[in-house]
Amino acid sequence: MSADVLRIAVCQLRMEWEGDANTANACAAIALAAREGAHIALLPELTLTGIHRRIREMAVPQRVDGWLHAVRAACAAHRIAACVGAPTFGDGGVLHISYHFIDAGGALLATVHKHGLTAPEATFFTAADLRPVVPLLGRRWGTMICREIDDHEQLAPRFRADRPDLVLWPGGMRPDPDKPRTDPPEHVQRAQALARECNTAIVMINWPNALNRPEESAECGASVVIGRSGALRITLPLAQAGVAVIDLDDGDVPLRAAWFSQGEAAAFGPRGPWPPC
């Protein structure tokens, strides 16, 4: 593999109610990504707790610390970097929705906090404007979390100034049910516009299912890779759990892709065809 090629694993993992199960899924995906030669495993928003009505039960410091330790240990054991979503805890019981960058030695390099919260999230979490650009694997990585894609006026000036090579977009996104359907969905079109304006690639890492309202799962998943030109390079399967291992050249053009479906528990199937069906 050329030194200019970055092999990423986009981990569109099935969301579970229990943090232990989500963490097992994350660690299994990290192991798979390493086995396939990926440099980094990318995981969704609140990877370890999930996004559901039991979040208050899961978002406990001792539990989250243990789950995050397990992910860091998996990175160190398999010599692979990862980005993972987990709450962070501040003074006075303050909680943030955060995204953590971990290197191939298991060290925590940086943490990004979500600023643009939904109304339900704001009843439990606190917004925080911590959005560093992280140098890792020869690239500069930016982050926006889930519905922050709607905050274009705040994001675009920052990304233009910070000039990240890639922006990670972990979330639990789906089309607005009250609006006409578009192809690609409106939230993806907004990301394409942001990529063009800021000359950055964007990698979406989306949950493929919804737990509070299972009927919404039909429109979940479909994570995307968007090039600096705004071109939609790759779309993962709709409403399917699995891991996509993708080679990107220095110009953010996919050179190779493979799909591994997630089966029962934390098991993944063999390499499947691309594009996956």
Report the location of each language-model feature.
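Extreme N-terminal starter segment of soluble prokaryotic enzymes
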Residues: 3-9
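Short polar catalytic/cofactor-binding loops
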Residues: 12-17
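Cys-nucleophile CN-hydrolase/nitrilase-fold catalytic domain and related Cys-dependent amidase chemistry
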Residues: 19, 27-105, 173-201
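Short amphipathic alpha-helices and their capping/turn segments at secondary-structure boundaries
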Residues: 24-38, 153-162
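Short beta->alpha transition motifs characteristic of CBS
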Residues: 49, 56, 100, 112-118, ...
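CN hydrolase (nitrilase-like) catalytic-core segments centered on the catalytic cysteine
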Residues: 63-83, 150-242
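Active-site catalytic loop in hydrolytic enzyme cores
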Residues: 90-170, 176-189, 245, 252-265
